[in-house]
Amino acid sequence: MLLSVKSPSLILVRAFAVVICFLSLLPTRDGRSFAVSIDPADVATFAAAAEQNAKLKSDLTWTFCAKRQRGWILYTPLIQRLLNTNAAPETNAFAQALADWQSSAGLPSTGVLDQQTWMKMVAVFQSRRIKDRSTPPPGALTRVSASEFFDPERPEDLRYVERQAYAAYKRLVAAVTADLSLDSNENWLKIISAFRSPAYQAQLRKQSPKSGRASLAVNSPHFTGRALDLYVGGEPVSTDDRNRAIQVNTKVYQWLVKNAGLYGFYPYFYEPWHWEYCPQYSVE
């Protein structure tokens, strides 16, 4: 989408470019000129990209698991983590960081988060998930106290976690509690669901036949005991966009996005509460 000549944003871009050129001519105290490396053409390019991103973040249409989706704003924290930026999607800085990432990913470096770029990002997110979903031997699982679950009355046979994943989870909870000064009496990061047997997963799918594989997979990572659903706010496991908007804006979720990889946990991008223990993936 090209900006019109009368666009206020283009007028500001041109004014900024003039200021840049003027500053480059000013002497410093030691008599040298300022070294300004910003290309006015790049400034204009990223301004145009930022204008498109401001619309696409809510309007981009795409499909995931046979379900039509709209926009990528719910995934902003994950995108910012991938791009290594804190810039908001509608800014020039975000567009520039995106262009750099696009170049490294073999995509046209437009700075626009269009469908091609977004689906590439989805592929990256999905690549950091559990591949082998075999059920572990009983000795590899540990039974967790009911007090560590969101539902303290959860049946004993549904309170198992793979041992190494549980140890990493405890370290993660200790870190986030210290960093964010969380109240230990609240439900933040309590376990909603962990190990599920194939038989129990089939039972859940039978109870919710319209849930789809995005929510209740036939070959679930929960079979491994290394996938944990954790409480990050709102309704615990609702994929309603309004609920996910609440979840992705909590300080706990945003901390996880930035730091969970240090403890071996990586997200399922579509469900803010779902984290998988995959220590084999390096933190980027």
Task: Label each PLM-derived region with a short phrase.
Residues 171-176, 192, 200, 221:
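Membrane-proximal structural modules of membrane-associated proteins and complexes
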Residues 110, 132-133, 203-207, 242-243:
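Short, solvent-exposed loop/turn and secondary-structure capping segments
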Residues 108-113, 177-194, 215-219, 264-272:
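Surface-exposed patches in mature extracellular/periplasmic domains of secreted proteins
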Residues 2-183, 261:
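Cell-envelope/ECM-targeting effectors and their regulatory/trafficking segments
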Residues 198-213:
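Charged, often glycine-rich, active-site loop that binds/positions anionic groups
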